[in-house]
Design a protein with these regions (language model features):
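Short runs of predominantly hydrophobic/aromatic residues within well-ordered alpha helices
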Residues: 41, 88, 92, 238-241, ...
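Short, well-ordered beta-strand elements within core beta-sheets of diverse protein domains
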Residues: 44-54, 123, 170, 239-247, ...
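Glycine-rich cofactor/substrate-binding loops
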Residues: 2-40, 101-102, 283-458
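Conserved hydrophobic residue
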Residues: 53-54, 78, 268, 383, ...
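Generic, well-ordered alpha-helical scaffold segments in large soluble proteins
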Residues: 44, 65-72, 94, 98, ...
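Alpha-helical coiled-coil oligomerization motifs
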Residues: 143, 147-150, 191-194, 260, ...
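A helix-coil-helix interface module used to build multimeric assemblies
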Residues: 2-205, 210-216, 278-279, 290, ...
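Charged, flexible cofactor/metal-binding loops and thiol motifs
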Residues: 120-121, 125-128, 132, 155, ...
Length: 458
């Protein structure tokens, strides 16, 4: 096949406009699928030869040439052209140039429709596996960090207002739990990715005696698609992956938001290592948390990729439409962004320095043990709603008189409720507040250690 000749050109009397070739070409981005395209083609050739659709000699010739093409591409010695259209045609044209008409037999019982669906599933199966591993490394870093901070007490927040004292380890383990669910979503997503569409052909299957199960075995797919129309038009496996990725990025972004806030002079809870910050071109004193900010910013790109795919798919008639060419760049971008953000965060968090003294001091402020005082009254038999009202009035009294609860006299306590006794003062420490919450999933030292033991023994 000559470089300018189209594999579908038999029906046409004229040449494709050069502007159309440039407009419709996807080779500049889908060439990253070359390994998967060749892997699928080798399996397809083996199956065709096994079924007697092509001769064994032809199969051997095709497979050898495909291996050589892959080596050239691996080395960067392959010249891609716009008039190749896409990665499938680039490889097929090169194959025919090298081995002649025998190369034209490779596309027997196959369409680019099922071919590209196969390439994307092979690609995404591999990338999902890699992301699961990288995610696991970040989870482990959170776990190790938490084990070192079990006794570190910090203020917990709701509405970004100080709420109750918590262990820093409890905070860090919250992100471990989020990332653990993220990994579970990806593993479940990978299960649905791992279905082979090859053999669906254009949309209706093929009348040739192919063996889809054999091809699936070669490509390590545990199942083949059950509906050829679904197989070539389905991109929900891509959407599901990007959706799972968007949730991962949401979790990373929330953590980065906290780091950005905590690293300010107003909070001073954490110092981000200089290696992960930058300065200002005009203000010499600045130390900016650019890495954390960029993770937060790149989250928007992944969200945009998800909406792009949902919008792309929502109005497509069955089955394949050229619109589906636009699914690859959002997918590739999502894969790249998620991997880079997971890796950079993993490198950054192991070098964080927490200001334990500042966290402890701030944990005691803002009447953070007020709930403990209410629960103290509950233990004395006071209904919770009544206790809530009593403590609310106590807080108002302290604010009006510029006092803290631990500075109140017993007489002042008793003026609000007669059930207060000297043991109330023990409830007012942040250490007591943290460790009394010894329920499953609570912030006490004992509960955190138990959860870590569960994780490490699983």
């Amino acid at each position: 096949m000559s470089k300018g000749e189209k594999p579908w050109g038999g029906r046409f009397s004229g040449h494709t406009d050069k502007q159309v070739e440039a407009f419709t070409a996807s080779i500049h981005f889908d060439k990253r699928l070359y390994r998967y395209d060749i892997e699928g083609s080798i399996a397809h050739a083996k199956m065709l030869a096994r079924q007697g659709i092509i001769s064994k000699g032809e199969g051997t010739t095709i497979i050898k040439a495909l291996g050589e093409i892959r080596k050239d591409m691996d080395r960067g010695n392959f010249a891609f052209r716009d008039d190749d259209e896409d990665i499938h045609m680039a490889i097929e044209k090169e194959l025919i140039d090298r081995i002649g008409e025998t190369g034209g037999k490779l596309h027997t019982a196959r369409s680019r429709n099922d071919q590209v669906a196969l390439d994307m599933r092979l690609y995404l199966r591999e990338e999902t596996t890699q992301i699961i591993l990288i995610l696991g490394e970040l989870k482990n870093s959170f776990l190790k960090l938490a084990k070192n901070e079990i006794t570190t007490i910090m203020p917990g927040y709701t509405h970004l207002q100080r709420a109750q004292p918590v262990s820093l380890a409890h905070y860090l383990m919250a992100y471990w739990e989020m990332l653990d669910r993220d990994g579970a979503r990806l593993r479940e997503c990978r299960r649905r990715i791992n279905v082979m569409p090859l053999g669906a052909a254009a949309l209706a299957g093929t009348g040739l005696p192919i063996d889809r199960e054999y091809a699936a075995k070669l490509l390590k797919f545990p199942a083949v698609s059950h509906n050829s129309m679904d197989a070539v038009s389905d991109r929900d496996f891509v959407i599901e992956f990007i959706s799972a990725s968007a949730i991962i990025m949401m979790h990373l972004s929330r953590f980065c938001e906290d780091l950005i806030i905590w690293s300010t002079d107003e909070f001073k809870f954490v110092d981000i290592d200089d290696a992960f910050t930058t300065g200002s071109s005009i203000m010499p004193q600045k130390k900016n948390p650019d890495v954390a900010e960029l993770v937060r910013g790149k989250t928007a790109r992944v969200y945009g990729n998800l909406m792009a795919l949902l919008t792309l798919m929502k109005g497509l008639p069955m089955t394949y439409n050229r619109d589906l060419q636009e699914d690859k760049e959002p997918l590739f971008d999502t894969v790249d962004r998620v991997k880079s953000c997971l890796k950079i965060l993993n490198a950054m968090i192991v070098r964080l320095t927490f200001n334990r003294e500042k966290m402890l001091n701030d944990a005691a402020g803002g009447f953070s043990t007020a709930t403990d005082v209410a629960e103290y009254l509950v233990k004395k038999g006071v209904p919770f709603r009544s206790a809530h009202g009593v403590v609310g009035r106590l807080v108002a009294y302290c604010l009006k008189n510029n006092k803290t609860m631990d500075s109140l006299t017993m007489h002042e306590f008793n003026s609000f409720h007669g059930e207060f006794d000297d043991d109330i003062y023990a409830c007012l420490t942040v250490e007591s507040s943290v460790n009394v919450r010894n329920v499953t999933g609570g912030t006490s030292e004992k509960a955190i250690k138990e959860r870590i033991r569960e994780i490490e023994s699983a």
